[in-house]
């Protein structure tokens, strides 16, 4: 808050803002017109007084009703005992005697009730009858009390009166609080603006040298003389603004209290209107209930007719159900006699067909296995035949090679053989070899022909066997297929017939189920209609009972209407008193208007003298709040904490960057950490 025993920058700024707020309030006071305020005060004071008188009348009325109710509650057992003693064993004709009402005179607290009953004896007799019925009945005496309607309405009135009283207490508390606030505001000490000016001057004024301080002290005397006059003018303006604030607060509190009272009075008016509407609606409700009673009679007649129709439908449905049950029994007998053997034959044929199919499948598997074996044997023989052909080809190549070798040897022998013996030997050998070759060729060819013939004959035998077996299998297959087709056709026909029979049976069962459901529904409808009939009879009886009871309520409401008319007459009398009060208030308002005119004259004088000085001070304050280094272009937003002098951010930043870190006013050195930001 304070640095070196002097105020900190935020405190100075707060003081400046307080000064600006005071000036704005002064301008608002000058713009307000007193005539409008006086008009509002007059109107609202009149409304407030009217509502206060209305509330007092309502409170008195409520107190009277509560007294009557309290007396009735406290004395009703003794009253009932007296009535029961007087009227025991008497008929209704004796009730019309005037001696009956003498009982009420025994109780002085029931004078109000006695006056109300004397005007209409039939109503009193009905009330007495109901009281006697409550004495005789053992249970539910409170619900049959003839004064229940009145007690309910009075309870509602008491609740609303309590709420109105609470609202009035709240308004009075608010008025007390506003008065206490006004007294506290008036007693508060007025802080003059000279203190704030001193704080600002101290924050702006150089504090380094003693010479400058002495120069400022000499100028202080002159400034203080000027400021004393301005302070006196400002105190007067503040007093005027406070007076106007007090008036505004009082007016607002008055307006709020008047609004609350208006709402409460409107609620009471609504209650009265609702009571009057209730009287008008009773007859309409009776007419509506009579029409509903006629509608109930028509409904009962309609239900009786519907019961007859339903009984007729039940008889028809029972007849149809009997016919359907007989048809279903006949159908079951025909089905068992005609279709059952056919189904058994079909089952037998299907089993035979399944066995034949199994045999055919087994034969097919055996034939396929035998054919596979024969094909494998044929392949093996073909392999053996190919091997033998390869051996023959190899032998032929060997023979050709031997012949070539013999030819070469013979040529060599012809050239080289010298001796004849050798030649003869060679010739003998060649002839022998040629003979052996021819015999071997013949033998080989014979073996080859025999093997080919044997293999060919065996192959043809196998083919003939396979063709014969194939023809037999095909004949069997075609026969089985024909038999299966015929059996399938028969099975299809039988299945179609069976489906048709199932559909007929399902339809019969569905129709039987629907008939049963319809019978159940008709029985439920009969039970409902019987319950509706019983309820309608009960409603008709209750309606008659209510009709008889509502007659008494209508009579009570008529009494209330007469009472409300008396209440309105009393309110009209109170209006005359309020008019006299209004005349007194108008005279007081004239006196206040004269006082307001005098205040306005003083206000104008203060305005003429105080505006010029305040404008000059504003200029000086603005000059003080601007930076002197940059020729008052920017606002001061930084302060050097060592000396307390303020400058703009740009000027101090330039000095820090250029290392000229001395205050331009006092020349004291500072660092970057000594600079403190402020907000003006």
UniProtKB/Swiss-Prot annotation:
Compositionally biased tracts (Basic and acidic residues): 210-229
GO molecular function: histone H2B C-terminal K residue ubiquitin ligase activity; ubiquitin protein ligase activity; zinc ion binding
EC number(s) stated in the UniProt entry for this protein: 2.3.2.27
SMART domains: RING
Localization (cell): Nucleus
The protein's enzyme class: transferase
Zinc finger (RING-type): 627-667
Domain of life: Eukaryota
Keywords noted in UniProt: Chromatin regulator, Coiled coil, Metal-binding, Nucleus, Transferase, Ubl conjugation pathway, Zinc, Zinc-finger
Chemical reaction(s) catalysed: S-ubiquitinyl-[E2 ubiquitin-conjugating enzyme]-L-cysteine + [acceptor protein]-L-lysine = [E2 ubiquitin-conjugating enzyme]-L-cysteine + N(6)-ubiquitinyl-[acceptor protein]-L-lysine
Principal place of residence: nucleus
Coiled-coil segments: 44-72, 261-288, 353-399, 485-609
GO biological process: donor selection; epigenetic regulation of gene expression; protein ubiquitination; transcription elongation-coupled chromatin remodeling
Pathway: Protein modification; protein ubiquitination
Listed GO CC annotations: HULC complex; nucleus
Region (Disordered): 206-233
Sequence similarity: Belongs to the BRE1 family.
Functional description taken from the UniProt entry: E3 ubiquitin-protein ligase which belongs to the histone H2B ubiquitin ligase complex (HULC) which mediates monoubiquitination of histone H2B to form H2BK123ub1. H2BK123ub1 gives a specific tag for epigenetic transcriptional activation and is also a prerequisite for H3K4me and H3K79me formation.
Matching PANTHER family: E3 UBIQUITIN-PROTEIN LIGASE BRE1 (PTHR23163:SF0), RING FINGER PROTEIN-RELATED (PTHR23163)
Oligomeric and partner information: Component of the histone H2B ubiquitin ligase complex (HULC) composed of at least brl1, brl2, rhp6 and shf1.
Official protein name in the record: E3 ubiquitin-protein ligase brl2
Record gene name: brl2
């Amino acid at each position: 808050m304070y640095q070196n025993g002097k105020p900190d920058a935020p405190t100075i700024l707060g003081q400046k803002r307080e000064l600006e707020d005071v000036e704005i309030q002064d301008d608002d006071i000058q713009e307000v017109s007193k005539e409008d305020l006086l008009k509002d005060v007059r109107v609202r004071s009149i409304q407030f007084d009217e509502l206060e008188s209305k509330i007092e009348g309502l409170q008195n009325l409520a107190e009277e009703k509560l007294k009557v109710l309290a007396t009735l509650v406290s004395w009703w057992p003794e009253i009932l005992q007296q009535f029961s003693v007087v009227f025991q064993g008497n008929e209704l004709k004796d009730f019309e005697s005037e001696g009956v009402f003498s009982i009420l005179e025994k109780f002085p607290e029931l004078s109000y009730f006695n006056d109300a009953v004397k005007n209409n004896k039939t109503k009193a007799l009905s009330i007495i009858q109901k009281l006697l019925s409550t004495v005789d009945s053992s249970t539910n005496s409170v619900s049959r009390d003839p004064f229940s309607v009145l007690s309910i309405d009075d309870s509602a009135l008491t609740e609303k009166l309590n709420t109105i009283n609470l609202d009035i207490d709240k308004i009075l508390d608010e008025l007390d609080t506003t008065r206490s606030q006004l007294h506290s505001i008036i007693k508060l000490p007025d802080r003059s603006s000279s203190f704030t000016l001193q704080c600002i001057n101290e924050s702006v004024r150089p504090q380094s040298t003693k010479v400058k301080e002495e120069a400022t002290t000499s100028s202080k005397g002159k400034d203080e003389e000027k400021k004393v006059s301005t302070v006196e003018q400002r105190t007067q303006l503040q007093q005027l603004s406070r007076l106007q604030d007090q008036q505004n607060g009082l007016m607002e509190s008055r307006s709020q209290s008047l609004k609350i009272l208006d709402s409460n009075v409107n609620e009471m008016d609504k209650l009265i209107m609702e009571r009057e509407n209730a009287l008008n609606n009773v007859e309409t409700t009776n007419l509506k209930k009579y029409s509903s009673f006629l509608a109930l009679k028509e409904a009962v007649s309609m239900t009786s007719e519907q019961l007859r129709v339903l009984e007729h439908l039940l008889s028809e449905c029972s007849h149809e159900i009997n016919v359907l049950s007989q048809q279903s029994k006949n159908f079951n007998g025909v089905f068992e006699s005609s279709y059952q053997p056919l189904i058994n034959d079909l089952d037998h044929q299907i089993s035979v067909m399944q066995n034949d199919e199994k045999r055919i499948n087994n034969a097919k598997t055996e034939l396929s296995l035998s054919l596979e074996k024969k094909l494998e044997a044929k392949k093996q023989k073909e392999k053996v035949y190919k091997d033998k052909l390869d051996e023959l080809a190899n032998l032929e190549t060997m023979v050709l090679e031997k012949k070539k070798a013999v030819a070469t040897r013979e040529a060599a022998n012809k050239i080289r053989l010298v001796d004849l013996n050798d030649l003869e030997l060679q010739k003998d050998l060649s002839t022998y070899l040629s003979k052996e070759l021819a015999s071997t060729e013949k033998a080989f060819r014979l073996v080859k022909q025999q093997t080919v013939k044997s293999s060919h004959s065996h192959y043809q035998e196998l083919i003939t066997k396979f063709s014969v077996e194939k023809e037999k299998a095909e004949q069997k297959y075609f026969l089985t297929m024909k038999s299966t087709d015929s059996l399938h056709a028969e099975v299809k026909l039988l299945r179609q017939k069976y489906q048709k029979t199932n559909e007929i049976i399902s339809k019969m069962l569905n129709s039987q189920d629907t008939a049963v459901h319809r019978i159940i529904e008709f029985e439920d409808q009969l039970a409902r209609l019987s319950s509706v009939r019983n309820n309608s009879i009960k409603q008709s009886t209750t309606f008659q009972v209510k009709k008889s009871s509502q007659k008494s309520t209508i009579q009570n409401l008529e009494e209330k209407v007469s009472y409300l008319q008396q209440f309105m007459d009393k309110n009209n009398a109170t209006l005359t008193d309020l008019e006299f009060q209004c005349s007194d208030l108008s005279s007081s308002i004239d006196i206040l208007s004269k006082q307001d005119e005098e205040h306005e004259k003083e206000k104008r004088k203060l305005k003429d003298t105080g505006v010029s000085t305040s404008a000059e001070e504003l200029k000086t304050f603005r000059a003080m709040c601007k930076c002197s280094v940059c020729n008052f272009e920017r606002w001061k937003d930084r302060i050097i904490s060592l000396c307390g002098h303020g400058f703009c951010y740009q000027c101090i930043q330039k000095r820090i960057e250029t290392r000229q870190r001395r205050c331009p006013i006092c020349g004291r050195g500072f660092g970057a950490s000594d600079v403190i930001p402020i907000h003006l």
